[in-house]
A protein has these predicted regions:
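Bulky hydrophobic segments
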Residues: 1-120, 125, 139-168
Length: 168
């Protein structure tokens, strides 16, 4: 599986696996986030109307608290930034925007389906949208940092060339 990979790719694989474990914990098992198992008599909850839950959290932010709104909206985005950041380093498919969107959306969809089947949290199309936005942000952060590093390396090479020209 990891034959022929660089140390950076191996480190990214390890980081991605740790990230997935943490993501699964918070999206499936974290009781502090209101996760209840099917044994608690919970009904399967779902939202298939885009922006419905986001709007509901905004409208009732005075009753639910601004923390609930931020946790739902910003939390769903931030939770998927690492996947958009790490996946391009470990998968060639994820080095272009369509590939990373497809993989990120698939991961999010699997988590939402797991929540529906085991009746923890809820299946929410708003979460799919917000998670995908997070993946895209992570992808562009990765791309920005790679270009920045490349430009730094090129500038360093240019300085070396100028020093060699001066020495000769």
């Amino acid at each position: 599986m990891l034959r022929g990979t660089t140390k950076l790719q191996k480190a990214c694989w390890a980081a991605f696996l740790l990230y997935l474990i943490a993501l699964l914990y918070y999206t499936i098992f974290a009781e502090s986030l209101g996760r209840r198992g099917a044994g608690d008599g919970a009904e399967a909850r779902y939202n298939l109307v885009l922006f419905n839950e986001i709007l509901r959290f905004w409208v009732y932010r005075d009753k639910l608290g601004m923390r609930a709104f931020v946790l739902n909206v910003v939390g769903n985005i931030v939770a998927f930034i690492p996947s958009g950041f790490l996946l391009p380093a470990i998968s060639r498919r994820c080095r272009r925007l369509p590939g990373i969107v497809l993989v990120g959306l698939s991961i999010s969809f699997l988590i939402e389906c797991t929540q529906l089947v085991f009746r923890v949290g809820s299946f929410d199309v708003d979460d799919l949208l917000l998670n995908t936005i997070g993946v895209i942000l992570g992808f562009f952060i990765n791309r920005f940092l790679r270009r920045w590093r490349w430009k730094r390396q090129m500038a360093k090479e240019q300085r070396k060339i100028k020093i060699r020209e001066i020495d000769t």
